[in-house]
C-alpha cells in the first residue's frame, strides 16, 4: 500500500528511567490508536505522555460522510476540527497518521483503512475509544484484522455515565422517566444540592419558570464565535465528490474547531447568555436564531469540551450570584440529565430503536424540508435557519419542525435521517432518541410520557412568527387557516387507540368528546385536504 498522508512523524525522544517499560517495547511493531471524528478530546489519558511506539490515526472517509446526507457545515466542521486536532498532536510530539478524503490510497472506510495500516506498519496492537454510534461500534467489534494483533477498546472518558447505567437504573420499569434519572444524577454528582442533600431552592426542576416569550429585550448577546476561512478545505471536499445539503459558509465558518475556541465560547455563554437562558430557553423569534442558547453542542458532542466542566461552570456561576437558580438548573438539566439520559436510552434499545414506527406514519417529507420554501412562517424560519446555520435550538426542532411532522404523519425514519444529517451537532446516539422518541413518539412512549404536539396557539404564544404569516393563527377550517390547528385535532382523533387512556391527555380527549360532530368532521375534512396538498403549503 502506498504511504498515506503523514501529518506527523517524530524521532523517538530519549527515554528516562521512569519509562523503562516503554523502552522495552518493539518500536518496529507499534500500537495503532484510532481517533474518530467525534473523539477530539485533548485531555484523554492517551495523550498524557508521548509514546514513540504509538501511532495515532485519524481518517476522513466516505463511509462517514455518506451514510446520510449531511449538512455542508457538519462535514466541513468535522474535517477542520480533525485536522486541527491532528496538527496539535504533532506539535505535542506524538506520531500521527492522517488520511485525507482525497488521498489516492484512502479506502474510504474506517475498517478497510485499518486493514491497510495494520499491514503497512506491522502493528502488534490496535486500540480505539468506545464509539458513540452503534453502527461504528459494531463495525469495530466485528472487525477481523488481516494479521494477528491485539484489539482493545478503551473508554472515551467523556460522559458522566456508563453506556448501560440508565438501563440498570430502570431495570424492570415499563417507562424510563427522565426526571427520576436526572435526580439520581444530581445526587450522585452532588450538583445543586444543599449540605443535607436536598435540591437547592427547594425543588428539583424549575421548568415552569423557563417558558417566557422574548419581547426583544434584553438584547441577544453578540456572536463572538471564531471566524475561519476554510475555503480551501471545502474545495477539497467538493472535489472528492462528497454530497451535502445547506450552506457551507466556508469563507466565514463560525463553529469552534478546537478546545481553546470551545472554552472561549463557554466563557462567553456563562457571562452573557446563561443569565437570561432560563427565562427564554423556550422562546421563538424570527428575528434571532441564537437568542441566549449556548451553541456548545457541537463542541460537546465532538468532545472538545467535557460535560463535567460545563456543568460545574454553570453551578459556580449560580453560587457566585451571577445567574439565577432557574437558569443554572435548566441548563444543567440539559447536560447532566437529558444528554446522559438519551444516550442510555439509545444503547439500551439499539439496533431496533432506529427502526421504530409505533404510529405507522409513512408520509414522505415535503420538498420544502430541503429548501425552506413554505408559507408557514414558523416552519420557513426554522428550516431556512437550519439550512443556513446547520443549527436550530431545541424548541425549533421539537415544537415547530417535529410538531408539524408528527401532526402530518411524516415518516419518522425519513425524518430521523433528515435530523441526523442537517444539524452540525447531530450524532445518532443523541439525535435518534430525540427524534424518534421525544419528537415523533415512534418508540411507543419508551421515552416520552405523551406526544409533544400543539396547535398554532403554542407557537403564537412563544414566538412572533404568526404576526407576519400567510396563515391565520386562530382560524381552523377557512382557506387561510393555520394547518397546525386542524391537524392537531385530527391527530388525536385518528390515534385514539394510543392516547385516549393517557392521563396526561385527559383534557384533550374531554374537549374532543364535547366537540360537536359536525365541527370534528369539518376539521378532519380540512386535514385531509391539507395532507393531500403538503407540497404547496
Cite the ranges covered by each PLM segment.
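N-terminal beta-strand-loop-alpha-helix module at the start
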Residues: 4-101
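Short His-Asn-centered micro-motif
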Residues: 34-38, 59-60, 99-101, 128-131, ...
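C-terminal catalytic domain of photolyase/cryptochrome flavoproteins
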Residues: 36, 264, 283, 287-537
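Gly/Ser/Thr-rich loops at beta-strand to alpha-helix junctions
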Residues: 39-41, 105, 130-138, 406
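A short acidic (Asp/Glu
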Residues: 43-47, 68-70, 108-111, 136-142, ...
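A eukaryotic "domain-start" boundary segment
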Residues: 64, 188-299, 480-485, 497-537
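A structural signal for the main folded, soluble domain(s) of proteins
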Residues: 94, 101-103, 116-120, 125-126, ...
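Beta-rich, aromatic/charged-enriched effector core domains that present basic-aromatic interfaces
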Residues: 109-255, 436
